[in-house]
């Protein structure tokens, strides 16, 4: 990894809560100064920011990164068939080496498309932590616990999470954080859910869970418990400001009140929800109710990539057509979802370009045909940009990508290893 301790991004268009032209000085892992008076002698490394939009690194709040190995598996199936007949049988063959290879490939893809932080739930997470440490990205990692209402399995799952906390939490200079990650109300017993929250509270960790992804899930729980998923989770004290609920597609007005009151964050996954025909999450309604909504890609096999630029555009367009109102979810609100809202959900001091924030920064090339003319840089980022327009990525003050070249990952090796790993599944 680069030894650079100071970086100057010179004369660039900065996109954060407002648009301005200035230079940015990074010292160690922090944005030290934003000014027009900075000189090339102020830093040991200077990056030319002209013809670039400089923006916060994107925050992917729901992923299963090692599922890169399952790209193209189970296409065109609805969720339960997709899980039961395609995904879970292949996941049963996973081991440490395969998860590491899949994670490394995902890091390469995420860095090259401007993601600097991701919130992940999967298996063999120590291997993903290792890939995070090596690649320089930032990850919140949870072991996906599923007990299928079996007592012995519950004990094993809690033990696995405790081991992950012990081995990986707050490692890699703080870039690896651990979350407690019970999979979903329909795969986890009440006891596992309760123990998960106690564990999260004890260690002051985030709790990451799938909730109300499909109508079937909601209907089944209502039949069993006479409660909707969020009502059920609230009844066992699972909801608070440290809860990140992935999907939240089928949410009632009463649940909206609960989510606002408990300050729960929602991770919206538009590509996945569309591909699996799960439904359209009521994002504009969440925002009207002052609920923090961020964006996630979900796993590659229900997307089928990790490009957060695609997710931003889909998020905006889907809400506009769903409400039949073109003014719904304007570009700034969408941008905030993929940056500062995600950072808020994860409790990380990033998501905007301001002095004192962590230096997680992406430079996007404006000088390409589909970005010209640049009348409004914000509009271009949401509606025109592609992940492949990312030119430079800095995370925690370290250069991870420069001139589109990965600096911390050998891309050829990552691709080769992932191809071999995928063959074993």
Swiss-Prot record:
<feature type="binding site">
    <location>
        <position position="64"/>
    </location>
    <ligand>
        <name>Zn(2+)</name>
    </ligand>
</feature>
<keyword id="KW-0862">Zinc</keyword>
<feature type="binding site">
    <location>
        <position position="91"/>
    </location>
    <ligand>
        <name>substrate</name>
    </ligand>
</feature>
<feature type="binding site">
    <location>
        <position position="213"/>
    </location>
    <ligand>
        <name>substrate</name>
    </ligand>
</feature>
<dbReference type="InterPro" id="IPR032466">
    <property type="entry name" value="Metal_Hydrolase"/>
</dbReference>
<feature type="binding site">
    <location>
        <position position="298"/>
    </location>
    <ligand>
        <name>substrate</name>
    </ligand>
</feature>
<keyword id="KW-0479">Metal-binding</keyword>
<dbReference type="InterPro" id="IPR011059">
    <property type="entry name" value="Metal-dep_hydrolase_composite"/>
</dbReference>
<feature type="binding site">
    <location>
        <position position="210"/>
    </location>
    <ligand>
        <name>Zn(2+)</name>
    </ligand>
</feature>
<comment type="pathway">
    <text>Amino-acid biosynthesis; S-adenosyl-L-methionine biosynthesis.</text>
</comment>
<dbReference type="GO" id="GO:0090614">
    <property type="term" value="F:5'-methylthioadenosine deaminase activity"/>
</dbReference>
<feature type="binding site">
    <location>
        <position position="298"/>
    </location>
    <ligand>
        <name>Zn(2+)</name>
    </ligand>
</feature>
<dbReference type="GO" id="GO:0004000">
    <property type="term" value="F:adenosine deaminase activity"/>
</dbReference>
<dbReference type="InterPro" id="IPR023512">
    <property type="entry name" value="Deaminase_MtaD/DadD"/>
</dbReference>
<keyword id="KW-0378">Hydrolase</keyword>
<comment type="subunit">
    <text>Homotetramer.</text>
</comment>
<feature type="binding site">
    <location>
        <position position="62"/>
    </location>
    <ligand>
        <name>Zn(2+)</name>
    </ligand>
</feature>
<dbReference type="InterPro" id="IPR006680">
    <property type="entry name" value="Amidohydro-rel"/>
</dbReference>
<dbReference type="GO" id="GO:0090613">
    <property type="term" value="F:5'-deoxyadenosine deaminase activity"/>
</dbReference>
<dbReference type="GO" id="GO:0006556">
    <property type="term" value="P:S-adenosylmethionine biosynthetic process"/>
</dbReference>
<comment type="similarity">
    <text>Belongs to the metallo-dependent hydrolases superfamily. MTA/SAH deaminase family.</text>
</comment>
<protein>
    <recommendedName>
        <fullName>5'-deoxyadenosine deaminase</fullName>
        <ecNumber>3.5.4.41</ecNumber>
        <ecNumber>3.5.4.31</ecNumber>
        <ecNumber>3.5.4.4</ecNumber>
        <ecNumber>3.5.4.28</ecNumber>
    </recommendedName>
</protein>
<feature type="binding site">
    <location>
        <position position="183"/>
    </location>
    <ligand>
        <name>substrate</name>
    </ligand>
</feature>
<dbReference type="InterPro" id="IPR050287">
    <property type="entry name" value="MTA/SAH_deaminase"/>
</dbReference>
<dbReference type="GO" id="GO:0050270">
    <property type="term" value="F:S-adenosylhomocysteine deaminase activity"/>
</dbReference>
<comment type="function">
    <text>Catalyzes the deamination of three SAM-derived enzymatic products, namely 5'-deoxyadenosine, S-adenosyl-L-homocysteine, and 5'-methylthioadenosine, to produce the inosine analogs. Can also deaminate adenosine. The preferred substrate for this enzyme is 5'-deoxyadenosine, but all these substrates are efficiently deaminated. Likely functions in a S-adenosyl-L-methionine (SAM) recycling pathway from S-adenosyl-L-homocysteine (SAH) produced from SAM-dependent methylation reactions.</text>
</comment>
<dbReference type="GO" id="GO:0046872">
    <property type="term" value="F:metal ion binding"/>
</dbReference>
<dbReference type="Pfam" id="PF01979">
    <property type="entry name" value="Amidohydro_1"/>
</dbReference>
């Amino acid at each position: 990894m680069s030894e650079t301790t100071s970086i100057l991004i010179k004369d660039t268009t900065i996109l954060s809560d407002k648009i301005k032209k200035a230079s940015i000085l990074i010292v160690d892992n922090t944005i030290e100064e934003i000014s027009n008076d900075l000189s090339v002698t102020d830093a040991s490394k200077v990056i030319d920011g002209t013809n670039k939009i400089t923006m916060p690194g994107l925050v992917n709040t729901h992923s299963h990164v090692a599922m890169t190995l399952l790209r193209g598996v189970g296409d065109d199936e609805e969720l339960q068939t997709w899980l039961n007949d395609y995904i879970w049988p292949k996941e049963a063959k996973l081991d440490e080496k395969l998860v590491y290879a899949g994670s490394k490939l995902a890091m390469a893809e995420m860095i090259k498309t401007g993601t600097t932080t991701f919130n992940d739930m999967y298996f063999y997470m120590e291997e993903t932590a290792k890939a995070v440490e090596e690649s320089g990205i930032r990850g919140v990692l949870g072991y996906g616990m599923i007990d299928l209402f079996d007592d012995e399995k519950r004990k094993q799952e809690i033990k696995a999470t405790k081991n992950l906390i012990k081995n990986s939490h707050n490692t890699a200079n703080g870039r690896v954080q651990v979350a407690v990650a019970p999979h979903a109300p329909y795969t986890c017993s009440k006891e596992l859910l309760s123990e998960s929250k106690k564990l999260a509270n004890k260690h002051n960790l985030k709790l990451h869970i799938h909730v109300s992804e499909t109508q079937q899930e909601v209907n089944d729980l209502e039949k069993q418990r006479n409660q909707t998923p969020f009502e059920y989770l609230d009844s066992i004290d699972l909801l608070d400001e440290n809860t990140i609920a992935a999907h939240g597609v089928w949410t009632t007005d009463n649940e909206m009140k609960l989510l606002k009151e408990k300050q729960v964050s929602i991770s919206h996954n538009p590509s996945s929800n569309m591909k699996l025909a799960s439904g359209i999450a009521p994002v504009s309604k969440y925002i009207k109710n002052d609920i923090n909504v961020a964006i996630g890609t979900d796993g590659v096999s229900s997307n089928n990539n990790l490009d957060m630029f695609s997710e931003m555009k889909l998020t905006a367009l889907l809400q506009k057509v769903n409400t039949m109102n073109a003014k719904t979810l304007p570009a700034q609100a969408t941008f905030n979802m993929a940056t500062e809202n995600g950072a808020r959900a994860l409790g990380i001091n990033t998501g905007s370009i301001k002095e004192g924030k962590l230096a997680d920064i992406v430079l996007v090339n404006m000088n390409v045909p589909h970005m010209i003319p640049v009348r409004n840089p914000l509009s271009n980022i949401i509606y025109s940009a592609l992940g492949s327009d990312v030119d430079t990525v800095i995370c925690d003050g370290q250069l991870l990508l420069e001139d589109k070249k990965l600096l911390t990952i050998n891309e050829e090796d990552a691709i080769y290893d992932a191809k071999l790993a995928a063959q074993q599944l």
